[in-house]
């Protein structure tokens, strides 16, 4: 319960923030809604390798932190981060060269294809950042840093709500603010994740020292 509940709460909070963003998306009409749905499907496909890496790294981190082998956890983090970054960066040329064809495979409406293609161009620049979120969360969750799960979920909620209200109301951005919001949320969340990892509070000796302090 101590490990599972914060992670479940994190997922719930993220889902709530997505619903808030969906409300903003719906306000821009059918073409934007259709393009957003397609981008979400593509994003789900892109995140499959990240999710698999996340699951494997969570187990790896848990086993090694249990054996008090912190250096192996750090090595796993670095190597997994490199894999995630390479995969994420590799999606950029694919999105820019074949984006229109990819969106066209889902829909034939010219306006939706145009919106979806540009949206894919925006988001693909930040898929490597998504990979770092998965890698960082995997290590932190695997090492039992349960308090962070709630903090991280709250970060996503606040970012999606605030950014969506700010960016979509800027006249020269308009509905493109939907995808700018997504990218900005990823960057902020990744920053918080990496910062938490670098703080080292997930390491057993530091957690124990913190408990004694309190």
Regions found by a protein language model. Name each.
Residues 31-32, 146-147, 174-175:
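Membrane-helix interface segments
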Residues 51-55, 123-142, 148-163, 177-194:
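Short runs within selected transmembrane alpha-helices of multi-pass transporters and secretion channels
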